[in-house]
């Protein structure tokens, strides 16, 4: 097993970037985000296609592989991105396990959909581009009702309990587990890193304002499905929040964040900053 399995505080001995600046995840302080009109909606391509996906227990997390027909653009991203995989971060029984926190609040679970910029074909190639990877993050909120499509995912996790085991979910649709695109116009954007080694500093992060629902029954089921490579229960799989350093978190204008008046000149400056941050 690689160092992903060790305690996050020891990652940097083998992966120096993990101890560097501009790491992820972060705590988003809504009072301090820069509200901008320059974050248009993302454009989801192939998200409604019916696909067969392979789920594999990677020893530290379970990855759901996505075909390259699932793509992403828009949202002020510099180009088109191809989906690679999605995975979840969770806590333990009764313990929340999201990676990003909002005003210090940790959510029960977080979904990450990883996309690699075209024409790169791997994380290794994309990591040299500051926006080589586009990561979509969805925070889950505990509800009394079940998430209607999450049981497929839970059942699949039950079939990949041990490191290296894999299964296929037939007839899966990504759009079944996330809200419709029309509900995803509002999000936070910042530039950061992968949250596992090597902590590649190449990620344009999108954290949606809209949360996903999960019942306590589903949450309990998820956290007890898998085991780490060590054989211990796979719980609390999230990296602690990292310092913001000199970064700015941008947000689309919506009711859930404080609205601030932005003059035309300010918007122009933000657009320039954002574009340069993403294309450096
Ligand atoms: C999914 O797998 C089934 C069974 O192997 C196959 O019949 C079907 O064509 C596959 N669907 C897609 C979209 O690839
Ligand atoms: Zn992740």
What are the language-model segments listed below?
Residues 1-280:
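Alpha-carbonic anhydrase
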């Amino acid at each position: 097993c690689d160092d992903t399995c060790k305690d996050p505080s020891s990652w940097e001995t083998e992966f120096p970037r993990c101890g560097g600046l501009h790491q992820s995840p972060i705590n988003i302080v809504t009072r301090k985000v820069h509200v901008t009109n320059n974050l248009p909606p993302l454009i989801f391509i192939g998200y409604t296609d019916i696909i067969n996906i392979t789920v594999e227990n990677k020893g530290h997390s379970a990855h759901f592989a996505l075909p390259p027909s699932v793509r992403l653009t828009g949202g002020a991203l510099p180009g088109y991105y191809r989906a690679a995989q999605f995975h979840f971060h969770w806590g333990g029984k009764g313990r929340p396990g999201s990676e990003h926190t909002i005003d210090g609040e940790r959510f029960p679970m977080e979904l990450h959909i990883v996309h690699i910029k075209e024409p790169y074909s791997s994380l290794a190639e994309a990591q040299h581009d500051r926006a080589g990877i586009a990561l979509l993050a969805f925070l889950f909120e505990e509800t009394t009702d079940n998430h209607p499509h999450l049981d497929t995912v839970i059942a699949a996790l039950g079939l990949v309990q041990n490191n290296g085991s894999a299964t296929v979910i037939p007839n899966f649709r990504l759009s079944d587990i996330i809200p419709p695109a029309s509900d995803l116009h509002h999000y936070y954007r910042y530039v950061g890193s992968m949250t596992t080694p090597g902590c590649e500093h190449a990620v344009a992060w999108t954290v949606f304002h809209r949360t996903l629902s999960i019942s306590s029954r589903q949450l309990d089921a998820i956290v007890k499905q898998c085991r780490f490579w060590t054989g211990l229960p796979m719980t609390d799989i999230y990296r602690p929040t990292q310092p913001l350093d000199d970064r700015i978190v941008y947000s689309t204008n919506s009711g859930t964040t404080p609205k601030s008046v932005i003059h035309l000149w300010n918007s122009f400056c933000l657009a320039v900053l954002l574009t340069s941050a993403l294309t450096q």
